[in-house]
């Protein structure tokens, strides 16, 4: 099976939704297995992307939350 490399998280999520829809209908067994395998690869890709974003957010928030001042000093 070839390695799945979506261009973005959103593309992977869209493909997962499409696979889910197609698997809910009538599908030959071999096609269903291939769709399941592709779905697993896409889920792993999405989980990795989410973990990377979470890690970046933790780095950005390392100094703790900042107070937001919405009042202008005019």
From Swiss-Prot:
Top enzyme class, one word, equals hydrolase
What's the superkingdom here? Bacteria
User: What is the first-listed, main subcellular location in coarse terms?
Assistant: cytoplasm
User: Which PANTHER family did the record assign?
Assistant: EXODEOXYRIBONUCLEASE 7 SMALL SUBUNIT (PTHR34137:SF1)
Q: Please name the HAMAP family in this protein's record.
A: Exonuc_7_S (MF_00337)
GO BP, one annotated term: DNA catabolic process
Q: What protein name does the entry list?
A: Exodeoxyribonuclease 7 small subunit
The reaction(s) catalysed by this protein are: Exonucleolytic cleavage in either 5'- to 3'- or 3'- to 5'-direction to yield nucleoside 5'-phosphates
Quaternary state and partners of this protein? Heterooligomer composed of large and small subunits.
The family classification in the record reads: Belongs to the XseB family.
Q: Give the keywords, sorted.
A: Cytoplasm, Exonuclease, Hydrolase, Nuclease
Q: Please give the function described in this protein's UniProt entry.
A: Bidirectionally degrades single-stranded DNA into large acid-insoluble oligonucleotides, which are then degraded further into small acid-soluble oligonucleotides.
Recorded GO molecular functions are: exodeoxyribonuclease VII activity
Annotated GO CC locations: cytosol; exodeoxyribonuclease VII complex
Cellular localisation: Cytoplasm
- Organism in which the protein naturally occurs: Neisseria meningitidis serogroup C / serotype 2a (strain ATCC 700532 / DSM 15464 / FAM18)
Q: Which SUPFAM superfamilies match?
A: XseB-like (SSF116842)
> Which EC number(s) does the record attach to this protein?
3.1.11.6
């Amino acid at each position: 099976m070839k390695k799945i490399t979506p261009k973005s998280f959103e593309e992977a999520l869209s493909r997962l939704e499409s696979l889910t829809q197609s698997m809910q209908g009538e599908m030959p067994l071999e096609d269903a297995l291939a769709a399941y395998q592709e779905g697993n690869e896409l889920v792993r890709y999405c989980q990795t992307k989410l973990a990377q974003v979470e890690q970046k957010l933790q780095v950005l928030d390392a100094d703790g939350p900042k107070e937001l001042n919405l009042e202008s000093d005019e």
